[in-house]
Amino acid sequence: QAIVGERQVDARRCISYLTIEHDGPIPHELRPLMGNRIYGCDDYQLACPWNKFAQRARVPDFDVRPALDSPTLLDLWSWDEAMFLRHTEGSPIRRIGFVRWQRNLAVAMGNALAATDSASEHHGALLTALHAWSARGLFTAPGREDDGALVAEHVQWALGQAGP
């Protein structure tokens, strides 16, 4: 949806922009298009003809981090801010901050709910995790009330994707 014409990209519709740079609510019409992407989108890397020459970087900073090696959405959703900071230390992911991280996860969880059978164990676990977050209320530090409201709005949207 970000490619709007020949050699034209609308960055406001780009998944990388929405998940990394954009600090407000993600537009409703773009949320389903994000799928399970919570930090950027490297689809352009797959399409780039020059990448057929790419080689694996031999720099430790580019190695897979254990906490980010194939985690589930539920694993990532269970992190508190301290865990987020610990697991993203030295990673570019850290710069989005914990609030955008949770916002992006809520969208991905909503999309997972829309794509899974409502009778499945995974569907139930996603619902339970989102409802648990909602039940805690907006416990945010003074001056950070807007952060809680941003995540709450995306959690409510995600819950709405569960179907009947």
Describe each PLM feature range:
Residues 11-30, 81-85:
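Short, charged low-complexity linear segments at domain edges
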